[in-house]
Amino acid sequence: MALAQKVASRPAVASRRGVVVVRASVESRRAVLGGLLASTVVALTSANKAQAAATPVDLFDDRKVRETGFDLIYEARDLDLRQSARDGLDQARGSIDATIKRVKESETRIDADLEGFIKKNYWTEAREQLRRQVGTLRFDLNTLASAKGVKAEKKKALELKKEFIQKVEDLDFALREKDETSALKKLEAAKSALDSVLAYVL
């Protein structure tokens, strides 16, 4: 009983939490609703402008490109299709005119660029240019050799190509050794080997 009286006689402790009272007036409600309405109107107007500025879908006729096999790598795997066709090697070998054009372009770059790079001692650029051109020349010379009808002519063309590749490997070694005089000599040997193989296959 005494405990109950002590508890009852204690003064009530005021809560430490503050109470926030918000009273919205009619004017503030109207301002909020007016702002909401204005932003909605602006959003709808900009959406209409964007739709008006949109162009129609452009349609392209890619049937010619698809016939050449451009999109084969994006299609599901066709097990009847050879890997060389999927990689584009058959398409590259299909046109002899395009192959001749690539070979002449490679010859021009070898004749024009390599000597300047070697004389300036730009070894990395010389090696990269040589390897870029020979990378396609290997396959293109094989294509031109296989276009020869007679087996003996084909064999002779492949022998000349093999000699050219050997001269290129010697030149590449001289470029890696950074020997200017040796590289210039081997460049001339590689050029003459390329000229002889091209004279035979073209």
UniProtKB/Swiss-Prot annotation:
Q: Where in the cell is it found?
A: Plastid, Chloroplast thylakoid membrane
Give the family from UniProt. Answer: Belongs to the PsbQ family.
Principal localization reads plastid
Q: What's this protein's name? A: Oxygen-evolving enhancer protein 3, chloroplastic
Q: Which PANTHER family match?
A: OXYGEN-EVOLVING ENHANCER PROTEIN 3-1, CHLOROPLASTIC
Which GO cellular component terms, listed alphabetically, does the Swiss-Prot or TrEMBL entry include?
Answer: chloroplast thylakoid membrane; extrinsic component of membrane; photosystem II oxygen evolving complex
Q: Which InterPro entries match?
A: PsbQ-like_dom_sf, PSII_PsbQ, PSII_PsbQ_pln
Q: Which UniProt keywords apply?
A: Chloroplast, Membrane, Photosynthesis, Photosystem II, Plastid, Thylakoid, Transit peptide
Provide the transit peptide span. Answer: 1-54
**Molecular function as annotated in GO:** calcium ion binding; electron transporter, transferring electrons within the cyclic electron transport pathway of photosynthesis activity
Any one Gene Ontology biological process term?
Answer: photosynthetic electron transport chain
